[in-house]
Amino acid sequence: MSYIQGESRQQQSLFPPTLDDFVPADHVCRVIEAFVDKLDMGGLGFQRAEPADTGRPGYDPRDLLKLYLYGYLHQVRSSRRLEAECRRNVEVMWLLGRLSPDYKSIAEFRRMHSEAVTKAGAELVRMARQVGLVRGEWVAIGGSKFRAVSSAGAVGEREAVRRYLDQMNGADEQDEVTIDPSAVAAAIEKLNSDPEPEARFMRMSSGHAPAYNVQTAVDAAYGIIVAHEVTTEATDNRSLLPMAEAAKRALDNPEMLNVVADAGYSNGEQAERCEEQGIVPHAPANRSINNQGDGTLFDRSLFIYDEKTDTFRCPANRMLTRKRVMKHKKTVQYAASAADCSQCPLKPQCTTAERRLLKRHLHDAALQRMNARATAQAMRLRRCTVERPFALLKYVIFGHPRFLLRGLCGAQAEVSLATMAYNLKTMMSVLGVTKLKQELA
């Protein structure tokens, strides 16, 4: 018995197979081609959407976008690896018509078209709406940290330089010390030469590291990412309104949109502005812990607020009146009478100060409404909707949650390509390749 034998490398064929014979009818490449060929590249902002009349011909941006979508769908993000795929991968040969762009052309396309790629992703969301995969009734918002290109040492050194310059500015204003102009000039030059000035230290599962905060808004029907944004904010408490507005725009501005998020998005002012625009936020209020007497004294929740009189009632039925408005903290401070507190038998359980003080957020009513809507069912919907896409983006599409491009613009381009790849995967899993291809045609 012999082994199964392959054909001789010198064997000629009377009817040579075409590239199309190597790509099945239900292959993802055919979906990518149907989607990209339907795009108005010029309208989306892609350069060289129409060939120039003079000069050396360039690559069609459609071909390079197809290449990147294929790469992100197969965990190939590097421009050099994509260049290699063009020469050895039959599927890529079919997709690009045997074109073999060099890695510089591939990398330059991604670097230059961050905004255009984001608009192309919005077109895919619009197509998903047309085929019924986006309902626009409930949207879950979430954020996750992705490592930046810069090392921790580089970002730490940059922060040290900034602190040094701040100290020099303070010393200059006070005229206390003699400042070396050459040292300041060297520090400024080093700061200006930083290749990734936007990266910030953020807390991640592996500790603090230079990172960006990736925000997504996911439709609850089938898990389509309808909006995304890359920010330099280490926390999420200022992202509720911008992400909710972005989701509403992507859904063609419905009259009412339910948005669910975790306690990290707790922001009374933004919740109120959401309600003014027909956006109904559902998120737990992220109140500070009770640190009165190491947690042994009366918590703020035991004090009852009267909206008509704008006062609080303490557990001893005494009144706390408005004292002042702290605009920079967006809070109102209330204080009990020192005379009432001095005679109160509950004072040892209430405060160690002369009198008890309380703070109330200026937009506390909106915060309370948002908190009341954050039911167990709504929080379960949030977990099931927004957590899975991040897992797929980080470990299936990216491979590891670290960017290849420096800067906020580069990170946005990568996330836009990754979310397009994720949405294509989701649409194919729901509709199937054949039906999706027909819908996109």
In which residue ranges do the predicted regions lie?
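Short, flexible loop/hinge motifs at secondary-structure junctions
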Residues: 1-19
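A ubiquitous short alpha-helical element
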Residues: 3, 50-55, 374-377
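Anion-binding and metal-coordination hotspots
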Residues: 5-6, 68, 75-88, 97-441
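A generic alpha-helix surface/boundary motif
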Residues: 13, 64-65, 122
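C-terminal catalytic core of Y-nucleophile DNA break-rejoin enzymes
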Residues: 22
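Basic, short loop/linker segments at the boundary and entry of helix-turn-helix/winged-helix-like folds
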Residues: 25-69, 74, 362
